[in-house]
Amino acid sequence: MGQDLPLLLSAALGKKVNRPPVWMMRQAGRYMKIYRDLRERYPSFRERSENPELSYEISMQPFHAFKPDGVILFSDILTPLPGMGINFEIIESKGPIIEDPIRNLNQIENLKELNPSESLSFVGQVLSSLKKDVNNEATVLGFVGAPWTLAAYVVEGKSSKNYSLIKSMAFKEPGLLHKLLDHFAKSIGEYLKYQIKSGAQVVQIFDSWAGQLSPEDYDIFAGPYQKKVVDIVKAEHPETPVILYISGSAGVIERMAKTGIDIISLDWTVDIEEACKRIPSGIGIQGNVDPGILFGNKESIKERIDNTFNKTKDRKYILNLGHGILPGTPEENAQTFFEHGKKLTY
């Protein structure tokens, strides 16, 4: 049975593998010409991510180009929001805009319970097609946004530099925010279960903005709700590996390890050797490579990959970037990342 599992899934489960698996956050996207050409034909991000044929095609673009060990669903962390009654749009140069930001009790009480098979059936379609067509040549990954990050978007109404609106709610009306976070935790847990049933073999939780919290506030507003999502998933799918990623996580790594996840995805602001000492040995590590290195020459990319890998010693490790690959990254440098990553050996 172990031989039939794809490499990334085997590694995530802690099985013995010959090399670390490699994939990239945002591996399908703007740095690829084939994606930019498709975007010209379909300028709406929501159409690209919610039309199952387009989402499937985009998800597969990097698989055809680079053969990564993971194929991640092309979607967005905000995709489940309309199913809860929160509408949004993604403007190309500005990012997400929430049409009616959530800022009072009445709005929170009127949120719908998410029914993924009803409002997100296109996601299920894409994942089941990926699982069938990738055929265990790679691991199919699903993903969600964590409650704190979703709340940050819906309260602020858009991306924010200082998060003053959600922090104002956190410190003036914490009960209100906890109600919103709890709603999101239940809905996101259900959404992840739906992704797994549809074909996702490994799932990643993005709490992109939890790094904006002090460790003390992380313990109040982020960690408990990450754990609630994980608990909901693990109750039904105890064997499915769960990865947690936070941007700017250096101050909360130990706390991340207490949420029940299997793998911590590191950004590049922490030394991976130090992180290995701070994270319990049973928990795997992913990422840590600065995406900016992919603007360098091939030798510097290879050297950084080698240095990062060598510091992980005998840890369960998945080669990835410390953030999504950046727009404008030369495609041949992404190719180097994947090719060199596959040459690593234990």
Curated annotation (Swiss-Prot):
Pfam families recorded: URO-D
The stretch of residues making up the signal peptide is none
Mainly localized where? cytoplasm
Query: Which key words are in the record?
Result: Cytoplasm, Decarboxylase, Lyase, Porphyrin biosynthesis
* EC numbers, comma separated: 4.1.1.37
Q: At what residues does the UniProt record annotate the site feature described as Transition state stabilizer?
A: D76
Its annotated pathway reads:
Porphyrin-containing compound metabolism; protoporphyrin-IX biosynthesis; coproporphyrinogen-III from 5-aminolevulinate: step 4/4
Gene Ontology CC: cytoplasm
Entry's Gene Ontology BP terms: protoporphyrinogen IX biosynthetic process
Its Gene Ontology molecular function terms?
uroporphyrinogen decarboxylase activity
List the Gene3D superfamilies. Answer: 3.20.20.210
Q: Where in the cell is it found?
A: Cytoplasm
Enzyme class label: lyase
Q: What does this protein do?
A: Catalyzes the decarboxylation of four acetate groups of uroporphyrinogen-III to yield coproporphyrinogen-III.
Q: Which family does it belong to?
A: Belongs to the uroporphyrinogen decarboxylase family.
Q: How does it assemble?
A: Homodimer.
Q: What is this protein called?
A: Uroporphyrinogen decarboxylase
What is the organism field in this record?
Prochlorococcus marinus (strain MIT 9215)
Show the taxonomic lineage: Bacteria, Bacillati, Cyanobacteriota, Cyanophyceae, Synechococcales
Which gene carries the instructions for this protein?
hemE
